[in-house]
């Protein structure tokens, strides 16, 4: 028994038995985590089973697996595929006639990281849609262009919805208080033609004024971009970061007119950074908005315009494979916020 357990799971027999008790030693978990990072399939299967637990340990293990799956944590090549295949096997077991009503399989019948990973692995479209329904429930679009249908939850060219972008960016702001991020908006109201950015800025200026770094996530019709108001040498600046084709002049003028509400008087204080980064990240404008907020959160006192220009320049030097990996991993990291 010692030989079998040690060869399969890198654990001693007492450590293996402890996995089925309420308390699992940090030493045993560390050994399993290390083996999983190195791609050990037996240990991946074992950890996926532990992640089913509805307690702090189960949550910790599930989060560890998802961090590997989404690229937040480094692992062996194809670690994401090994993990989601293990989750898919569990999902199949959870839905057989014997176990489908068992509460121990709760995480595979309700929105969870495990269920999301299982859904990413299945190639059966009807099962994929069934899993997506459990994860997403009923969602409604804030704009006509948003794709909230369940059939494309794992699609690599899916446009992010307002709610998904809001959940992810709110999560980032909680981790870093340096930014104030507003709920995503459309630039122009579809029926009244009201400039919604202008209205929100008027309200903020009338109430408490702008924060040191105030971020607006704006949809121009079929595209997300970042609009940042910040202070540089006690002067308010406005920065628009657009990762697709240049905006048309009407859209630019709407943003400029809204920005002047804050006291900006010179167009030179409004900076448009426009670089197409989406050739290998289709419909990835929301992903870049999320990543931009990450960058700004970690930029400290650096000039935001310099930070974002350098990012855009560096991103274009990445290989197609690296840009594609950014697309896959960032989508997974963003959707995790909607699973919490």
Curated annotation (Swiss-Prot):
Origin species: Salmonella typhi
Gene Ontology BP term (one): proteolysis
Function: Effector proteins function to alter host cell physiology and promote bacterial survival in host tissues. This protease targets the host cell ubiquitin pathway by acting as a deubiquitinase in infected host cells.
Keyword Chloroplast among UniProt keywords: no
Protein name: Deubiquitinase SseL
Highest taxon above the source species: Bacteria
Tagged with keyword Transferase: no
Classification via Pfam families: ElaD-SseL-like_C, ElaD_SseL-like_N
Annotated family: Belongs to the peptidase C79 family.
Lineage of the organism: Bacteria, Pseudomonadati, Pseudomonadota, Gammaproteobacteria, Enterobacterales
Places the protein is found: Secreted; Host cytoplasm
Annotated GO MF terms: cysteine-type peptidase activity
EC annotation from Swiss-Prot or TrEMBL: 3.4.22.-
Enzyme type, top EC level: hydrolase
Keyword field: Host cytoplasm, Hydrolase, Protease, Secreted, Thiol protease, Virulence
